[in-house]
Structures are given as structure tokens and as C-alpha cells.
């Protein structure tokens, strides 16, 4: 739909290819092809939407190098918040509440088992660098923890080239509510309406509703 409705559409290559190292490579995070498109179109600004390339600090840096305005966070902000372990520690240092977690990566299966026992099942296994619901698995019991670790690590490596994971307590019955903040280069800041995104499949949002029912 977006390609059909666009004034111009640029082919970035095959949508998805398997690399020799087992990683999955997708065209929209190919910085070389994206640079070609930015140069060819003489783009003045780039807004890549949400998720994936929109959360790559390297793409924001590419835009800076080309003199293209990147509509999104700075590379420094992305690096501070793009790593889930680093962002949790940052939130804790500011006195903000976070979902109970192990406090450190799950470096081994034995370490993960110890952490999960302290947190209490069920737990979530999450890739520290994962986005878009990738690299996330549930572990209901100690018996399902090894497969959850293996699955989360494998998926995170395939998509992001990172296999570091950590454990977090699973909160059943919780709701997923987003609040986005929009700011400009002149100090203007706006908090956008909250959005309900609890309807998900495989940890990926299916429906977003605003305003949030019940709030």
C-alpha cells in the first residue's frame, strides 16, 4: 500500500536473505542501500517509521553524515535506551519503577536457572538488543527455561547479531500502554495521547487503540 501510494518508490533489494553466518538480513536495514536511496533522491529528511531501522543509531549517524535531518531520537539516546539492560539500569538510577528482573545478563543456563528461581516463575527471557517482539520467549517452569533461552538467543542472533539475554518476571494480566513524546529542535515538547497495544501475537502488536479504554 505504501509503495503504491508513494510519489516515488525505491527498490532496496530482496526483502530478506539468509546470510552465511546464519543471520537474517533484511533490505530495510541495509545501510549501504539506504544511503544510495538518500543520495539519489536528494532527501532533506528521513523518517523511517517505528521499529527496526528507526531504532538503529547507525542510521541516524548516516543521516547526520549526509546532512539529512533524521526525524527521531539522537544516536546517543538510542544507544542509552536501545539496550534493555542499560535502559533498566538507567531507569533504576533515576528512581523509576521497573518490572522485577535478574539485574544482570543470563550468562549460562545454570545462571539463568538461579535467577529464575529467585524471581519466581513464570519468567520472560528477553534479548537485550531485541526489537519488534523478536528475541522474546516465555518460561512457565524450570523445565521450559532451557528451550526458552535457546529460542530467544537464536532469534536475537538471527535478526540482530546479538545473543545476550536477561530474565524478567512475567506479569500476567498486565496491559501494554504506550505514551509517546514528540519534540522539535527548538525546545518544543508534546506528550501524545496514550495508546492501548495489549492485543498481540508472538509479542508483536496487532491493534493499537487511542484513547486507552479504561484510563
Locations of regions flagged by a protein language model:
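N-terminal beta-alpha lobe that positions the nucleotide/phosphoryl donor
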Residues: 1-215
Amino acid at each position: 500500500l505504501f509503495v503504491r501510494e508513494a510519489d516515488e518508490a525505491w527498490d532496496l533489494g530482496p526483502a530478506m536473505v539468509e546470510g552465511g553466518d546464519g543471520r537474517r538480513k533484511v533490505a530495510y536495514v541495509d545501510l549501504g542501500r539506504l544511503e544510495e536511496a538518500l543520495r539519489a533522491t536528494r532527501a532533506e529528511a528521513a523518517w523511517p517509521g517505528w521499529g527496526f531501522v528507526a531504532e538503529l543509531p547507525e542510521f541516524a549517524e548516516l543521516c547526520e553524515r549526509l546532512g539529512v535531518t533524521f526525524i527521531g531520537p539522537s544516536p546517543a539516546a538510542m544507544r542509552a535506551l536501545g539496550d534493555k539492560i542499560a535502559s533498566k539500569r538507567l531507569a533504576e538510577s533515576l528512581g523509576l519503577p521497573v518490572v522485577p528482573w535478574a539485574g544482570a545478563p543470563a550468562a549460562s543456563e545454570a545462571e539463568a536457572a538461579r535467577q529464575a528461581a529467585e524471581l519466581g516463575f513464570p519468567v520472560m527471557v528477553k534479548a537485550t538488543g531485541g526489537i519488534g517482539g523478536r528475541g522474546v520467549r516465555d518460561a512457565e517452569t524450570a523445565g521450559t527455561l532451557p528451550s526458552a533461552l535457546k529460542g530467544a538467543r537464536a532469534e536475537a542472533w538471527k535478526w540482530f547479531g546479538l545473543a545476550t539475554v536477561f530474565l524478567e518476571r512475567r506479569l500476567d494480566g498486565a496491559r501494554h500502554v504506550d505514551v509517546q513524546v514528540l519534540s522539535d529542535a527548538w525546545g518544543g515538547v508534546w506528550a501524545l495521547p496514550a495508546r492501548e497495544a495489549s492485543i498481540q501475537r508472538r509479542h508483536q502488536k496487532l491493534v493499537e487503540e487511542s484513547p486507552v479504554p479504561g484510563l
